[in-house]
Amino acid sequence: METYLTIILGILLSEVLRRCCLVLLHAFTGPLSKVPGPFLSKFTKLPWAMELVKGTHLNTVGPLFEKYNTEILRIAPDTVLVADSPSIHKIIVTDDLPKDPIFTKFRSHKKVFLNGFSPRYLDGLEPLMQGCYDQFEKVLESRCAEGGGYAVIDMANTLSNLAFDVMCATSLGGSFNLTTSNDLTLKKSLGLALKLASLQSQVPILKYVPFVADYLVSDMNNMVEDIITRRRSETGEVPRDLLQLILDANIEDPVFFSEQRIREELKMLIVAGSETTSMAVTQTLLLLVNNPEKLKSLVREIDTSFPSPNDEITFSKTQDLKYLNAVIYEALRLSVHPTVMMRYTDKPTILSGYEIPPKTTVQPWAGTAMTDPKIWPDAIQFVPERWLGEYKGAVAEKKHFYSFSGGSRNCIGQQFAWREMRLILGRLVHKYEVSLIPGQSHERRSHTTTRFLQGFYNVGVKPREGF
């Protein structure tokens, strides 16, 4: 018996030693061995996984690129981050590398949603959007009246509520009126869902402990179930919105588009269609109130285009406002940096001067590329004028702009987001003075979408005289 035990232990020890040797060989002699990065990243993805779970990677990666004086980083044995714009363009446009395998279950959803994001369809959503913005303005009016003509508004959460209502009103069967109720229950559940998703992506076994997810995000799950049940119980003609497109896809192919897939897609829509847009608008306001001269230029353009307080601000009237568009582009460049553009090499390729082998996850790091001083003069400064013409010898080129990803896999909802951002900002600065509340933290955390570490961002709001 002891002999058999000795043999088994010997086999196990040999296997452990074999695997250790393979790890060492891959770390020091493999194709990625010359790519700069933290020492531990040669052997394990654990340090990077911890950053993702904590949501701090948004803040720590930039300094790592500076520390190693490189435009490519090895942050796990088979994963690299790429920060130079030509290589990013090669990854997502020229070579159009396939998505990382972890996104396999989300394949083909673009085809389902295509009609739901066509320009004609989006134009038809304007009355629903405007109705939500009317409620937003009523909230501001009420708060200012309570404060004697001035109010401090938590724009991070208020705009999050607004974007949530817009998404539900236009795409999911009806608004939940969070803008007026300020009920944080669903938003807290959504935040927990995003954190849980980050944790599950690094500790996959948690996906098989269903009671954990059900307990933490029960409010979110109940909301999705309510949306589905309500629509399926309707009789007569139903709206041809995104919800119906998803349900129709399930009817056409219940195997590929299963009941579980319906729920996953709805949750994805809620996140992508509300949290990303609201944070983009909040960041734009943050930059404007911290740069009052730029804010004055925007107000001047809005006043010129809409001289009367009764002028209606619409999709068509805002799409060609040059300074408004420049403000949004610049705010997105500085603060909206997608961190889920992972691609996968299916053959050897050269990125940032290094040979990258097949079966490597390559992740474009847009934040560093969009603040590269070689491309963007005064790279970390808020300069909307760079989008209006030459600035300090350089012209802003949209091929270096990645806030909506790029190539064949760019963000399908970007035109929805552009319409929403233009209307919110246009209507807000048309009727209200917005001002800086000093002493606030700008530090953020990221779990799929970003949020302020302090949990809020306050802006002073005051009705404009004559408006």
Predicted regions and their residues:
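C-terminal helix/juxtamembrane-tail motif
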Residues: 1-4, 452-467
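Conserved, non-catalytic sequence blocks in retroelement Pol enzymes and Pol-derived host proteins
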Residues: 32-36, 53-55, 119-123, 233-236, ...
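Cytochrome P450 heme-thiolate monooxygenase catalytic core
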Residues: 99-108, 124-281
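Conserved cytochrome P450 K-helix/beta-meander segment immediately N-terminal to the heme-binding cysteine loop
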Residues: 364-392
